[in-house]
Amino acid sequence: MNTVDFSKGLVPTIILDDQNGEVLMLAYMNQESYQKTLETGYTWFFSRSRNELWNKGETSGNTQKVKQIWTDCDNDTLLIRVIQTGPACHTGKKSCFFNLIKEDF
């Protein structure tokens, strides 16, 4: 099992829908939120703006049940496949990635 490199404090964490591979969101984990994710089976993140841990869906009910956790080649970025309940984005959209900048290159 790979060890996640938390030497910089936070690691970017990409959340994918386990059913269709859609990118749902990007958040950050520190060692404590990562450990809570492993212990509970649901995503926990570190809020940079509030400087605290948060459990995705704790207040909204839009939870993320973890199916798989992957790390990149440098062990400093995570990719987590989840079963998403409700929308992932705080705007009410399924994914946080809904603003197309350009296509057809």
UniProtKB/Swiss-Prot annotation:
The keyword Heme does not apply. Disulfide bonds: none annotated. It is found in: Cytoplasm. Mg(2+) binds at D72, D74, D76. Its EC number is 3.5.4.19. Its cofactor is Mg(2+); Zn(2+). One of its GO terms (cellular component) is cytoplasm. InterPro entries: PRA-CH, PRib_AMP_CycHydrolase_dom, PRib_AMP_CycHydrolase_sf. It catalyses: 1-(5-phospho-beta-D-ribosyl)-5'-AMP + H2O = 1-(5-phospho-beta-D-ribosyl)-5-[(5-phospho-beta-D-ribosylamino)methylideneamino]imidazole-4-carboxamide. GO terms for biological process: L-histidine biosynthetic process. Pathway: Amino-acid biosynthesis; L-histidine biosynthesis; L-histidine from 5-phospho-alpha-D-ribose 1-diphosphate: step 3/9. Its main location: cytoplasm. Binds 1 Mg(2+) ion per subunit. Transmembrane segments: none annotated. Zn(2+) binds at C73, C89, C96. Homodimer. Catalyzes the hydrolysis of the adenine ring of phosphoribosyl-AMP. This is Phosphoribosyl-AMP cyclohydrolase. The lineage of its organism: Bacteria, Bacillati, Bacillota, Bacilli, Bacillales.
